[in-house]
Regions:
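Thiamine diphosphate
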Residues: 2-124, 130, 138-144, 212, 282-283, ...
Length: 359
């Protein structure tokens, strides 16, 4: 958020009354009577109330605004879900930015701060659309879509977006992915040509990097991968349930096929979905995935360690994703079990490792 300080200024009724120590640098701390940033400190209830005031000003003052409330994601729905429900009840419009998301991405802060469930909690609020973008172009597309929903389509909606603090390469936006981003999933990269078995790998947030690592590991065993980016399991589920309802009410007409089924419906190809959130998040689409579906998530309390160690601990790193794919292929009869055993030995992983979700 630091670049925003100098450009937009932190709101202060009397302006800046002192010279900050970083006043000579480009991204300096700047307060202004015309500042657009409200810095509320460790005051979740007060900050959320300020957000509600701005998010409802289109109706209370006939003055539309687009508020962005950025916070430690663990202290969003975990702390003020009742206020967010109140915001929805007041037909608020705006963006809730769950920064420092991910049970392994915010490393080193233990069980108090490491959030792996806010996306699940967000889905309980009927006015909230919950997103988990992996790349900058996904984030930009989601924000543009959100503003259009609020003030183009005149919908009273809130958009919760999981944001992370891990640096990794941001690719250019591929052609023709806007619809998939908004509907919750799109094909990032198809399987290369060849004769080897195919798996479908689904990633979101920074764990997409682990998915890409798994692709390389699987290639070493002659396995080809399709890569999907899941920007919103909640939106996929919402549409899936709507299609199920329509089909139930119109039994004599052709069935509607939800987007997730169009993406992952081939029963012959195993699907592996991995997330830096609880397994229940990607598991929201299970009923529309017809093939062998494996979900990897971060159930349990957080830990203080490096990201690499945490992702090994929660079994969501590239090795875990690759092993899950190989296991599914053994189950489907596409490869021999000796391939899986060879990979286990190569990665130094034991089948007798304790389930960390057990207390």
């Amino acid at each position: 958020m630091v670049p925003l300080f100098a450009e937009f200024g932190i709101d202060h009724p009397e302006g800046q009354l002192y010279k900050p120590v970083d006043h000579k640098v480009l991204m300096k701390y700047k307060e202004s009577a015309q500042g657009q940033l409200l810095e509320e400190g460790i005051n979740e209830a007060g900050a959320t109330s300020t957000f509600i005031a701005s998010a409802t000003s289109f109706s209370t003052h006939h003055y539309p605004t687009v508020p962005f409330y950025t916070f430690y994601s663990m202290f969003g729905f975990q702390r003020v879900a009742d206020l967010i429900w109140s915001a929805a009840d007041q037909r608020a419009r705006g963006f809730l930015m769950g920064a420092t998301s991910g049970r392994t991405t915010l490393n080193g802060e233990g069980l108090q701060h490491q959030d792996g469930h806010s996306l699940l909690m967000a889905h309980t609020n009927p006015a909230v659309r919950a997103w988990d973008p992996a790349f900058a172009y996904e984030l930009a597309t989601i924000i543009r879509h959100g503003i259009d929903e609020m003030y183009g389509q005149d919908k009273d909606v809130l958009h919760y977006i999981a944001l992370y603090n891990e640096n990794y390469p941001m690719p250019a936006k591929p052609q023709g992915v806007d619809e998939g981003i908004i509907r919750g999933m799109y094909l990032l990269r198809g399987a290369p040509k060849g004769d080897g078995p195919i798996v479908r790998l689904v990633g979101s947030g920074p764990i997409m990097v682990q998915v890409l690592d798994a692709v390389e590991k699987l290639e070493a065993y002659g396995i080809r991968s399709e890569i999907y980016s899941a920007t919103s399991y909640g939106e996929l589920r919402r549409e899936g349930l709507a299609c199920d309802r329509w089909n139930r009410l119109h039994p004599s007409q052709d069935e509607k096929q939800p987007w997730v089924e169009q993406m992952l419906g081939n029963a012959d190809v195993p699907v592996i979905a991995v997330s830096d959130n609880m397994a229940a998040v990607p598991d929201m689409i299970r009923q529309w995935v017809s093939g062998h579906f494996t979900v990897l998530g971060t159930d349990g309390f957080g830990r203080s360690d490096t990201r690499e160690a945490l992702r090994r601990f929660f079994e969501i790193d590239g090795k875990a994703v690759a092993l899950a794919a190989l296991s599914s292929l053994v189950r489907s009869g596409s490869i021999d079990s000796s391939v899986y055993e060879q990979a286990m030995q190569e990665y130094g992983i034991s089948t007798e490792r304790q389930d960390i979700t057990e207390l």
